[in-house]
Amino acid sequence: MHTHKAKRVEITIEKIMQSRLSDALVKADVHGFTILPVYGGSGRSGLWDRTGQVGRAEGMVQFICIVREERLDALLTAAFKVVEKHIGVVNITDCEVLRAERF
């Protein structure tokens, strides 16, 4: 089966920023993404999980986007405008897809 090269972008950000990041991606013509809950992890401040959090933050979410390489800069530019001043991580990896017309 023939595969096609693409980029997988994972953006982990505070849940409170979910709608702003969704809107920014759609405005940048990135319509295909999945949003998953993040239950915990470890970072510069040590281990954390979402239990016992107080306030509006409600933990973290992760966006997963798969795009053609020529769409990557538009996605990153839109995402960075939202992510740059907040807690978050952006990860980019090479991947392959079966149906290139979907991306």
Regions inferred by a protein language model and the residue ranges of each:
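Positively charged, small/polar-rich N-terminal and surface patches that mediate targeting and assembly
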Residues: 1-103
